[in-house]
Swiss-Prot record:
It comes from Mus musculus (Mouse). The keyword Coiled coil does not apply. Residues 1265-1310 are cytoplasmic. Pfam families: F5_F8_type_C, Laminin_G_2. This is Contactin-associated protein-like 4.
Length: 1310
C-alpha cells in the first residue's frame, strides 16, 4: 500500500475527529436545547404592529393559553402586521411552535420568521437556504412545530403573517424552544486590532483550528493574520463581502500553485449580521467553513509545515513588516467566541493577559448599525415620499444593492420648469434622464456593473442651471442645461417603482420596478425617517419590507453543475453551460453519449467521439476513438505505443516504463466498468531476459495496472494462473517453465498476448530488471486499451404481471436528479418507477397508450408533466424516457417529441426528500404495475442492474428480446436485422454493402483488361449440394425478374459495365456506347434482336459518379439514372432468362454471341470505378473483394478495392489509380485474355511484365540485405550497437516484424 495514501487517510481521520470535537464544544448543550423560552416572559417582552383590542394584545400570544381573547390579533389583517418577542438576551432557538386564536376562526396559514440582536435590522430565517415562509395552522387549536436547522442565535424574534384563514382574521399563539447561549464579544472600530502571543511549545506546526463569529460594518477588512520570517502566512480577509482564506508556504513574491491556498467562501457577509467561521488545518488538509458552507482543500507539494511566528493578530496586521506587502484594511465590527486552538482569545483580553496586546480602542459590547434598510420585494414595490415644493433646488441621495441590472430607482416631477426626472438602473449602469416639453430627453450615464449585489451610493441634485449625479463618489462627466428658471420639486418622490395608474400618478417606469435594498434615503439633505413610514405617519408604500435587507446570493452555493457559470437576478439564478459539455437549466445533463455502443445505435460510423461514462455524474467527458464493427470497440490511447528496447538493467537499476492515457484514471475506470469486455495487448520480446527468478519465485519483470498493484501474469493469462499464454496452452519452449522468456535462450522469443482482466486494466507501468547480463535484452510494446459493449445499455428486465416489481435502495437526488430508461410494451398503462417520502414523491408512468406522465412533489404541492404522442407508445417498440428535476425546473422528454418543462416556484421548497425503497415496474401497493420491458435504467448517471435483481424476483425475467423492431431501421441497403442476447446486428450477406449497418460502399477500381466473373451454375450447384453437370439443371435456372443496382465512374467509351449471359445465348448487357450514351440491351430470345434502351442525353463517360437502378418484372423494365431520369419500357424479345450462366463486370473474354455494340464494348472492357453492385440477392463485387464464405467468383487483371468518390475537377481515372489497396481476390485467373484483344492491350501487358520484373528485383535485394545483416550481427554480437535504426533492423529481421517497418520506435539505454 502506498504510504502517502496511508498518511493522507490518517490526516483526514484526525481532521474529522477534531471537527466533531470542536462542533460539540461550539454547540455547547445543543443536544439538550429544547426548553420553552416564551411562557415565562413578562408582558413587556411582547409587542406587535397593532392589536384588535386590549384583549387581543401581544401579551396573550402564549401557546396553549386562553388569557384575554385567546391570542394576538392585529387591528387590520394584512401582510404588514407582526408579533415580536424579546427573549431578554441572545438565546439559541432550536424550534418554534404556532397555534391559532383560542376558540375562534382566527389562525395563520403561513408566516415569516425574523430575528435580530437589537430589535432593528431584521434578518429572515430561511429553510433549505431558500424557503421564505413557514406553513402555519389549519385550525385554531392544533400546534404546528418546526425544528430550526441551523438554530437561531438572537434576542428578538418577529413573526410576520403572510396568509390566514380567509373566513377569519390573523390570530396567533406561539412558543419558541431553545437554551442559553454563551456569547463573549469584542468590538473593533476599524483602527484597532489584537495581537496574541503564545508559547511555542503549545502548538503544532502542522495543525491549526480557528473558530469565531463576526458581524461587520464594512465590506472589507482583515480578520486574522499570522506570518513567518520566510514569507509563510495564514490570512483571513473580508473582501467585498466575501471571505478569502490565504495560506502560503514560502516567499509570497514567489507564489506557486503548489504552495498557495486561496479559498473563497461566503457572500453578502457585510449585512451587519453574525456569521460563523471555522478553519481547520492538518498538514495538507484544510477545511474552511463559513456559516453552512464548507470547502475542503488538499494541498500539493511540500506543504505539511508552515514556518510561522508565535503570534497571531486579529482585526488587522499588527506587524506589517513581517507580512506580505499587500494593501489591507482593518476590520470594523464585532468578534464573538474567538478561539485559537482551543484558547478563548477574548477571554484573555478581558483578563488583561500579558499574552494579548490590544492596539487601538476595543469594547466588550457590539455597536449597533444606525442605518435602517428596506427591501423592495417585487417589481410592484414602491415608496412614495413627500418633498417640499419651496426649495430652490432638488437633491436626493441613497444607497442601494441589487442583483438586477435594470429597474426604476427614482422618479420626480418638476415644478416651474415643466418636466420630470427619471433615475434608472439600465444594463448595470445608472441613467438619469430629464424630460422637458418640446425638447429631446437629456441623459447622464454613470457607473458600471452596479447590479453586483454590493452597496452603491447615489446622489443627484438639480439647481437653477445645473443637473448632476454622483455614483460611489464619482461625479458624472456631463450635465444637461436646465435653463435660468428656478427648479422646484413636484412635491413627491417615487422610489423603486410607481403606483397603479388608477392612483392618478404621472410616474413612469420604462424598465420595470426595482428589486433590491435601499438605505440612508435623504431628500433635500434631510434623512427620511423610515420608522415613521413603517407606522404610516409618512408617505406611502407597497410590498416593502422595512428595517430589513432581504437580499440573498442565489449562486452560493453554486447550483450550476459541471463548471457552469452562475449569474443571478433578484428572484432567480441562471447557468451558462457554454463549453462545459453539459446542458439543462443547471448544466446537469451531458450532451454526449455514455459509450461507443450508444453512438453506434444512433447510426454513427467509426470516428472520434466524446463520451461521458457516468452521464450526469462528476466525471468530465473525454475524447476517444470508436471503431464501429459488428461490435462497437472503444479505443483509448496512451503515450507509449512505440516499441521500446531495454538493455543493461538489474534489480537496483530497473527500467520503468510509465504510460499516460488521454483520459484520467477515474474516467477510464468508468468506461471499463460499463464495458462487457476489455483487453490490452502487451507485446513482450526477450533474449536472455527472464520474467521470474526461478530460485525464489520472485518476479524479474512485472507490470502495474490501475489498482497500483504488481502483476506477474502476462498476455493471454489471468491473475489466478500467474503464467503466460504458452503456460496455459502447455506449449512453452521449455516445458518446466510457464513462460517462453524463462527458458533464458540466447535468441529472441516472446510472451505476447492480450490482458483481459478488467479490474487490473489499463496497464500504467512496466518494470524490467533482467537485461544486465551479456547479450541480454528485452523489448516491449503496449497497445491501446480496447473495450467493447455497454452492459448497462442492454441491461433489461421483463415484467410479466401487474403485481410484480423490482425494488432498489432509496433514490437520493435531493437537489438535482435525472432518470432515464427505455421501455416497450403492448399494455395500455402502467407505472415505470415510483419512490415515496413522507410527503414528497416521484412517479413516472404510462398514463395511457399515448401519454407518459412524470409526477412529483418536493413540498410545494404535486405537479404533473405529460408528453402526448400522435402515435401509440404501446407499439412494442423501444421508447426513450428522460426525466430531470432541479432547483430551476422539472422536465420530461420522450423520444424526439417536444419536451414538457415546469418551472420551479420562486423561493419554494427545493429538497426532494424520499425514504421508501425505489420501486421499478410497479408500486408499493402492487397496483397499476407495468407489463413489458424496461432497459438501461439510470439514475443520476448510475445504472441499476435490472437483470441481477430480476433473477430472484417472481414475475420478472432478466433480459428482453425484440430489439430489431426498433433498431432494424439502422440496417440499410438490404441488410437484415438479427437478434442477439444483448442487442442486435445487421446481416449484410445479401447486400452489396458492408459495415455494422450495411452502409459501407464496396467499390473497386478496374484496370484495363480486368474483370470480375460470377458463375451462376457453380453457385447453383453449391447451393443444391449437387455434382451433376450444369446441363442437367439448365432448365431450373430461369429468371422472370431481377433487380440491378450499381454506381460507376469512368472517362472511357465504349465500356462494358455489366453483362449477364445464359446457356441459350440470351443476355443482358449494360454498356457505354462509343458516343458516351448509356445503353441497356436485353435479349431474352436468341431468335430475336435485342431490345435496346438508350439514354443519350449526355455522355456518361464524363468522370462523374452515376447511379443506375434497373427493375424487370417479366417484360416490363423500369430504369432510373442518377435519381432524376426515369423510364419504363416493355420488352419484345421475351419475358425470362433461361439457364442463366454468368455475370461479368468489366472485360469479357468471349463475346461471339452478342450484338456488335456489345461486342465492341466487351473488347474494351471497363476502366474506372464500380461500386455497390447488386444483382437481386447477389453482390458479385463484394464477393470478390470481401472475405467471407466461398463464392463462385473469378477475378482477372487489376481489380483493387477503392473509392468511387473523387473531388470535383479531377480526372476520375487518375484519382482511382492513386489508391494503393492490395489486389483482392476470389479465384485469381492468370490466363491472358488475348482472344479478341485490340492492339492497345499489348502496352498494358508490357507494363505488367515490367512491374513483375521490378518486384522480383526488389525481393532479391531485400533477401541479400537480410543475409548481410545476419552476418554483421553475428560478427558484432558482443558489442552493443549505438545506432537505433540498425539495432531495430536486427530485431525486425530476427522476429520478422514486417508490420512495424517505418515506425518511430525507441531504444532505452542505461
Amino acid at each position: 500500500m502506498n504510504m502517502g495514501s496511508v498518511a493522507g487517510a490518517v490526516l483526514k481521520m484526525l481532521l474529522l475527529l477534531s471537527t466533531q470535537n470542536w462542533n460539540r464544544v461550539e454547540a455547547g448543550n445543543s443536544y439538550d436545547c429544547d426548553e420553552p423560552l416564551v411562557s415565562a416572559l413578562p408582558q413587556a417582552s411582547f409587542s406587535s404592529s397593532s392589536e384588535l383590542s386590549s384583549s387581543h394584545g401581544p401579551g396573550f400570544a402564549r401557546l396553549n393559553r386562553r388569557d384575554g381573547a385567546g391570542g394576538w390579533s392585529p387591528l387590520v389583517s394584512n401582510k404588514y402586521q407582526w408579533l415580536q418577542i424579546d427573549l431578554g438576551e441572545r438565546m439559541e432557538v432550536t424550534s418554534v411552535a404556532t397555534q391559532g386564536g383560542y376558540g375562534s376562526s382566527n389562525w395563520v396559514t403561513s408566516y415569516l420568521l425574523m430575528f435580530s440582536d437589537s430589535g432593528r435590522n431584521w434578518k429572515q430565517y430561511r429553510q433549505e437556504d431558500s424557503i421564505w415562509g413557514f406553513s402555519g395552522n389549519a385550525n385554531a387549536d392544533s400546534v404546528v412545530y418546526y425544528r430550526l436547522q441551523p438554530s437561531i442565535k438572537a434576542r428578538f424574534l418577529r413573526f410576520i403573517p403572510l396568509e390566514w384563514n380567509p373566513k377569519g382574521r390573523i390570530g396567533m399563539r406561539i412558543e419558541v424552544f431553545g437554551c442559553a447561549y454563551r456569547s463573549v464579544v469584542i468590538d473593533l472600530d476599524g483602527k484597532s486590532s489584537l495581537l496574541y502571543r503564545f508559547d511555542q511549545n503549545s502548538l503544532s506546526p502542522i495543525r491549526d483550528i480557528i473558530s469565531l463569529k463576526f458581524k461587520t460594518m464594512e465590506s472589507d477588512g482583515i480578520l486574522l493574520h499570522r506570518a513567518g520570517p520566510a514569507g509563510d502566512h495564514i490570512t483571513l480577509e473580508l473582501r467585498r463581502g466575501k471571505l478569502f482564506l490565504l495560506i502560503n508556504s514560502g516567499d509570497a513574491r514567489l507564489t506557486s500553485s503548489s504552495t498557495l491556498i486561496n479559498l473563497t467562501l461566503g457572500s453578502l457577509l457585510d449585512d451587519q449580521h453574525w456569521h460563523s467561521v471555522l478553519i481547520q488545518r492538518l498538514g495538507k488538509q484544510v477545511n474552511f467553513t463559513v456559516d453552512e458552507h464548507r470547502r475542503h482543500f488538499h494541498a500539493q507539494g511540500e506543504f505539511n509545515y508552515l514556518d510561522l511566528d508565535y503570534e497571531i493578530s486579529f482585526g488587522g496586521i499588527s506587524a506589517p513588516a513581517k507580512s506580505v506587502s499587500l494593501p489591507y484594511k482593518h476590520f470594523h465590527g464585532c468578534l464573538e467566541n474567538l478561539f485559537y486552538n482551543g484558547v478563548d482569545v477574548i477571554g484573555l483580553v478581558k483578563e488583561h493577559s500579558p499574552q494579548i496586546i490590544t492596539m487601538g480602542n476595543a469594547s466588550f459590547s457590539c455597536s449597533q448599525p444606525q442605518s435602517m434598510p428596506l427591501t423592495f420585494l417585487s417589481p410592484r414595490s414602491y415608496l412614495v415620499l413627500p418633498a417640499s415644493t419651496k426649495e430652490e433646488a432638488i437633491s436626493a441621495s441613497f444607497q442601494f444593492r441589487t442583483w438586477n441590472k435594470a429597474g426604476l430607482l427614482l422618479f420626480s416631477e418638476l415644478q416651474l420648469v415643466s418636466g420630470s426626472l427619471l433615475l434608472l438602473l439600465s444594463d448595470g449602469k445608472l441613467k438619469l434622464t430629464l424630460y422637458q416639453p418640446g425638447k429631446s430627453p437629456s441623459d447622464i450615464t454613470a457607473g458600471a456593473g452596479l447590479g453586483d449585489g454590493q452597496w452603491h451610493s447615489v446622489s443627484l441634485s438639480a439647481k437653477r442651471n445645473h443637473l448632476s449625479v454622483v455614483v460611489d463618489g464619482h461625479i458624472s462627466p456631463a450635465s444637461p442645461w436646465l435653463g435660468p428658471e428656478q427648479v422646484n420639486s413636484g412635491g413627491v418622490f417615487y422610489f423603486g417603482g410607481c403606483p397603479d395608474k388608477g392612483f392618478g400618478s404621472k410616474c413612469k417606469s420604462p424598465l420595470g420596478g426595482f428589486q433590491g435594498c435601499m438605505r440612508l434615503i435623504s431628500i433635500n439633505n434631510k434623512m427620511v425617517d423610515l420608522i415613521a413610514v413603517q407606522q404610516g405617519a409618512l408617505g406611502n408604500f407597497s410590498d416593502l419590507q422595512i428595517d430589513s435587507c432581504g437580499i440573498s446570493d442565489r449562486c452560493l452555493p453554486n447550483s450550476c453543475e459541471h463548471g457552469g457559470e452562475c449569474s443571478q437576478s433578484w428572484s432567480t439564478f441562471h447557468c451558462n453551460c457554454t463549453n462545459t459539455g453539459y446542458t439543462g437549466a443547471t448544466c446537469h445533463s451531458s450532451v454526449y453519449e455514455q459509450s461507443c455502443e450508444a453512438y453506434k445505435h444512433q447510426g454513427n460510423a467509426s470516428g472520434f467521439y466524446y463520451i461521458d461514462s457516468d452521464g450526469s455524474g462528476p466525471l468530465q467527458p473525454f475524447l476517444l476513438y470508436c471503431n464501429m464493427t459488428e461490435t462497437a470497440w472503444t479505443v483509448m490511447q496512451h503515450n507509449g505505443s512505440d516499441l521500446m528496447r531495454v538493455r543493461n538493467t538489474h534489480s537496483e537499476n530497473a527500467h520503468t516504463g510509465v504510460f499516460e492515457y488521454t483520459a484520467s484514471m477515474e474516467q477510464l475506470q468508468a468506461a471499463i466498468n460499463r464495458a462487457e469486455h476489455c483487453q490490452q495487448e502487451l507485446v513482450y520480446y526477450c533474449k536472455k531476459s527472464r520474467l521470474v527468478n526461478q530460485q525464489d519465485g520472485s518476479p524479474r519483470s512485472w507490470w502495474v495496472g490501475r489498482t497500483n498493484e504488481t502483476q506477474t501474469y502476462w498476455g493471454g493469462s489471468l491473475p489466478v494462473h500467474q503464467k503466460c499464454t504458452c503456460g496455459l496452452e502447455g506449449n512453452c519452449i521449455d516445458a518446466q517453465y510457464h513462460c517462453n522468456c524463462d527458458a533464458d535462450l540466447n535468441e529472441w522469443t516472446n510472451d505476447t498476448g492480450f490482458l483481459s482482466y478488467k479490474e487490473h486494466l489499463p496497464v500504467t507501468k512496466i518494470v524490467i530488471t533482467d537485461t544486465g547480463r551479456p547479450h541480454s535484452e528485452a523489448a516491449y510494446k503496449l497497445g491501446p486499451l480496447l473495450c467493447r459493449g455497454d452492459r448497462p445499455f442492454w441491461n433489461a428486465a421483463s415484467f410479466n404481471t401487474e403485481a410484480s416489481y423490482l425494488h432498489f435502495p432509496t433514490f437520493h437526488g435531493e437537489l438535482s436528479a435525472d432518470v432515464s430508461f427505455f421501455f416497450k410494451t403492448t399494455a395500455l398503462s402502467g407505472v415505470f418507477l415510483e419512490n415515496l417520502g413522507i410527503t414528497d414523491f416521484i412517479r413516472i408512468e404510462l398514463r395511457s397508450p399515448t401519454t407518459v406522465t412524470f409526477s412529483f412533489d418536493v413540498g410545494n404541492g404535486p405537479f404533473e408533466l405529460s408528453v402526448h404522442s400522435p402515435t401509440h407508445f404501446n407499439d412494442n417498440q423501444w421508447h426513450h424516457v428522460r426525466v430531470e428535476r432541479n432547483m430551476k425546473e422539472a422536465s420530461l422528454r420522450v423520444d424526439e417529441l417536444p419536451p414538457k418543462i415546469q418551472a420551479a416556484p420562486t423561493d419554494g421548497h427545493v429538497l426532494l426528500q424520499l425514504n421508501s425503497q425505489l420501486f421499478v415496474g410497479g408500486t408499493a401497493t402492487r397496483q397499476r404495475g407495468f407489463l413489458g420491458c424496461i432497459r438501461s435504467l439510470q439514475l443520476n448517471g448510475m445504472a441499476l442492474d435490472l437483470e441481477e435483481r430480476a433473477t430472484v424476483t417472481p414475475g420478472v425475467q432478466p433480459g428482453c428480446r425484440g430489439h430489431c423492431g426498433s433498431y432494424g431501421k439502422l440496417c440499410r441497403h438490404g441488410g437484415k436485422c438479427r437478434e442477439k442476447p444483448s442487442g442486435f446486428f445487421c446481416d449484410c450477406s445479401s447486400s452489396a454493402y458492408a459495415g455494422p449497418f450495411c452502409s459501407k460502399e464496396i467499390s473497386a477500381y478496374f484496370g484495363s483488361g480486368s474483370s470480375v466473373i460470377y458463375n451462376f451454375q457453380e453457385n447453383y450447384s453449391l447451393s443444391k449440394n449437387s455434382s451433376f453437370h450444369a446441363a442437367s439443371f439448365h432448365g431450373d435456372m430461369k429468371l422472370s425478374r431481377e433487380m440491378i443496382k450499381f454506381s460507376f465512374r469512368t472517362t472511357r467509351a465504349p465500356s462494358l459495365l455489366l453483362h449477364m449471359s445464359s446457356f441459350y445465348k440470351e443476355y443482358l448487357s449494360i454498356i457505354i456506347a462509343k458516343n458516351g450514351s448509356l445503353q441497356i440491351r436485353y435479349k431474352l430470345n436468341k431468335y430475336h434482336e435485342p431490345d435496346v434502351i438508350s439514354f443519350d442525353l449526355k455522355s456518361m463517360a464524363d468522370g462523374q459518379l452515376h447511379h443506375i437502378k434497373i427493375n424487370r418484372e417479366e417484360g416490363m423494365v423500369f430504369v432510373e439514372i442518377d435519381e432524376n431520369t426515369r423510364r419504363q419500357t416493355y420488352l419484345s424479345s421475351g419475358t425470362e432468362f433461361s439457364a442463366v450462366k454468368s455475370l461479368v463486370l468489366g472485360r469479357m473474354l468471349e463475346y461471339s454471341d452478342v450484338d456488335q455494340e456489345t461486342a465492341l464494348a466487351a473488347a474494351h472492357g471497363f476502366t474506372g470505378c464500380l461500386s455497390a453492385v447488386q444483382f437481386s440477392h447477389i453482390a458479385p463485387l463484394k464477393a470478390a473483394l470481401q472475405p467471407g464464405p466461398p463464392a463462385p467468383v473469378t477475378v482477372t487483371g487489376h481489380v483493387t478495392e477503392s473509392s468511387c468518390v473523387a473531388p470535383s475537377g479531377t480526372d476520375a481515372t487518375s484519382r482511382e489509380r492513386t489508391h494503393s489497396f492490395a489486389d483482392h481476390s476470389g479465384t485469381m485467373d492468370d490466363r491472358e485474355p488475348l482472344t479478341h484483344a485490340i492492339k492497345s492491350d499489348s502496352a498494358v501487358i508490357g507494363g505488367l511484365i515490367a512491374v513483375v520484373i521490378f518486384i522480383l528485383l526488389c525481393v532479391s535485394a531485400i533477401a541479400v540485405r537480410i543475409y548481410q545483416q545476419k552476418r554483421l550481427y553475428k560478427r558484432n554480437e558482443a558489442k552493443r550497437s549505438e545506432n537505433v535504426d540498425s539495432a531495430e533492423a536486427v530485431l525486425k529481421s530476427e522476429l520478422h516484424i514486417q508490420n512495424a517497418v517505418g515506425e518511430n520506435q525507441k531504444e532505452y539505454f542505461f
